[in-house]
A protein has these predicted regions:
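Long, hydrophobic, well-ordered secondary-structure blocks that form the structural core
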Residues: 1-12
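C-terminal catalytic domain of Rieske-type non-heme iron oxygenases
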Residues: 12-15, 19-245
Length: 245
């Protein structure tokens, strides 16, 4: 590509932890120490994100502000009501751990499988077996590692409107998981349907439950009847996200 013919400008970029970090300014400097902080850098380095393989991406359009979409990932006390027939069957509601790193954060959701895992020696505990880590990366990224791979959620404003947004959901899997799928396919098992089930399961919870409730909340905010909102002590992630913006 002849960059001079297309008006393209080279932006500063680095690849680290399997992520591509790009600065929006041509003379910008990317400093991950400043962006993430030493503790989060160390934590990311302990994972194996760089081996993840991209499998699928979906786009969800919503009638709400993009920040409300991010907020749907920020607490679990609503699980017993909004997700009573879905997530609440696999997760304990109103039970989470949160830590902040600069303008970022990490929420730990408590799976019901932790009840059995806690009976094992601590040396056999696995963070993804008993919980779901949910990383918030300022300003618009939600990243969730799973035993099989990871979900990456990117929220964007749409149509230059504070009342519209869209989400891009990317699904990643570790190579050994995809190899297992291929091996099962060779035996005649429709193993790829297992991947489709993951996509559809995530979509049904996010699109049909979380985003519906958040869009309804957006309409309520537009009424002008609320002068302020109060975040509770069981919503530390929402405190952090609000301060970061």
């Amino acid at each position: 590509i002849d960059k001079d013919c297309y008006g393209l400008k080279e932006l500063p970029a680095i690849e680290k932890f399997g992520f591509l970090w790009v600065h929006p300014c041509t003379d910008g400097v990317i400093n991950l120490d400043d962006l993430l902080g030493e503790k989060l850098l160390t934590e990311f380095d302990s994972w194996d994100f760089q081996s993840l393989v991209f499998a699928n991406e979906e786009k969800y359009e919503t009638e709400m502000n993009w920040k409300l979409a991010i907020d749907t990932f920020g607490e679990t006390y609503h699980f017993s009501v909004l997700h009573k027939d879905s997530l609440f069957e696999s997760f304990h509601g109103n039970c989470q751990l949160f830590d902040s790193f600069k303008r970022n954060g990490r929420l730990i959701l408590c799976k019901r499988t932790i009840d059995e895992m806690r009976k094992l020696p601590e040396s056999e505990w696995n963070i993804c077996a008993g919980s779901l880590p949910v990383y918030y990366l300022f300003p618009n990224i939600i990243f969730m590692p799973t035993p099989e791979g990871a979900f990456l959620v990117k929220e964007y404003p749409a149509e230059k409107s504070p009342h519209k947004s869209f989400s891009k959901i990317s699904f990643y899997f570790y190579p050994h998981v995809l190899e297992q799928i291929d091996q099962l396919e060779k035996t005649g098992v429709d193993a790829k349907q297992l991947l489709e089930d993951q996509y559809n399961g995530f979509s049904s919870v996010i699109q049909d439950e979380d985003y519906v409730a958040a869009a309804s909340s957006h309409k309520g905010l537009l009424s002008g009847n609320l002068d302020f909102l109060t975040f509770g002590k069981n919503e530390p992630a929402l405190h952090q996200i609000g301060r970061a913006h």
